């Protein structure tokens, strides 16, 4: 039974390797349900996964999965310990965490460029993963790990590529790599370094001539009035007092 499982796994891996560029080390994205099933089945993932897939593997998860396991409490404490030992891959939900299934689904968008495997016991997530071409799916049944066969969506995609209707992501990457080797496509980083900041001319608004202010007639008139000198009476104070006394008599 074990030999037949490995034969099926080898066949499925060859399909994904030839058509989608899946290669070692195989990156296995685990969610909380898969970790819990491995714990109950006493499956040593780090030891048994490389033997089953016949190659080097990397156990991975996301922050959203870890956050979800923390919120679920003590019932999934063992699954959380397994997930914490995995490599954490960056997901687009750094500020606002989402559910583990939604997060893993977002990690395999746009043709699964990082060649992730999705390992889950969630049936709803499995159905959604099967609708995305080129995503290997793993699950645990009867305490044994299984690599699912390519989904009908994946097989239809490969047939469309073979007939020339579509171009796979793997082919796009290989074409781009060949162009870069032949110098047909310049490296974006080098082109950015070569770009220099253009010397900009002076601000046209600063070149305008300053308008002369018209003289303010009212202010000038008030200034003239203010400049008039006050005539002081410089007569002798004694004389003034005598005049005032005479007038009083």
From Swiss-Prot:
Its main location: nucleus. Disulfide bonds: none annotated. InterPro entries: Fcf1/Utp23 (IPR006984), PIN-like_dom_sf (IPR029060). Residues 240-249 have a biased composition (Basic and acidic residues). One of its GO terms (cellular component) is nucleolus. One of its GO terms (biological process) is endonucleolytic cleavage in 5'-ETS of tricistronic rRNA transcript (SSU-rRNA, 5.8S rRNA, LSU-rRNA). Residues 180-249 are annotated as: Disordered. Residues 224-235 have a biased composition (Basic residues). Keywords: Isopeptide bond, Nucleus, Phosphoprotein, Ribosome biogenesis, rRNA processing, Ubl conjugation. Pfam families: Fcf1 (PF04900), UTP23_sensor (PF24779). SUPFAM superfamilies: PIN domain-like. It is found in: Nucleus, Nucleolus. The modification Phosphoserine is found at residue 174. There is a cross-link at residue 179 (Glycyl lysine isopeptide (Lys-Gly) (interchain with G-Cter in SUMO2)). CDD domains: PIN_Fcf1-Utp23-H. GO terms for molecular function: mRNA 3'-UTR binding; mRNA 5'-UTR binding; RNA binding; small ribosomal subunit rRNA binding. Involved in rRNA-processing and ribosome biogenesis. Belongs to the UTP23/FCF1 family. UTP23 subfamily. This is rRNA-processing protein UTP23 homolog. It comes from Homo sapiens.
């Amino acid at each position: 039974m074990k030999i037949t499982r490995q034969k099926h796994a080898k066949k499925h891996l060859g399909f994904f390797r030839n058509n989608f560029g899946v290669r070692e080390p195989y990156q296995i994205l685990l969610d909380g349900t898969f970790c819990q099933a491995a714990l109950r089945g006493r499956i040593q993932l780090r030891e048994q996964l490389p033997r089953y897939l016949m190659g080097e593997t990397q156990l991975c998860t996301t922050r959203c999965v870890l956050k979800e396991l923390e919120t679920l409490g003590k019932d999934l404490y063992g699954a959380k310990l397994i997930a914490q030992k995995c490599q954490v891959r960056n997901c687009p939900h750094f500020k606002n965490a989402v559910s583990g299934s939604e997060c893993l689904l977002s990690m395999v968008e746009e043709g699964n460029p990082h060649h992730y495997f999705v390992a889950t016991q969630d049936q709803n997530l499995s159905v959604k993963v099967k609708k995305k071409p080129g995503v290997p799916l793993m699950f645990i049944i009867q305490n044994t790990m299984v690599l699912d066969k390519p989904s009908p969506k994946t097989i239809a995609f490969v047939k469309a590529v073979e007939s020339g209707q579509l171009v796979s992501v793997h082919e796009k990457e290989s074409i781009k790599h060949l162009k870069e080797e032949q110098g047909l496509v310049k490296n974006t980083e080098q082109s950015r370094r070569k770009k220099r900041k253009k010397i900009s001319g002076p601000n046209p608004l600063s070149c305008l001539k300053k308008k002369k202010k018209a003289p303010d007639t009212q202010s000038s008139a008030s200034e003239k009035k203010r400049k008039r000198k006050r005539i002081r009476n410089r007569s002798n104070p004694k004389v003034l007092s005598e005049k005032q006394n005479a007038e009083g008599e």
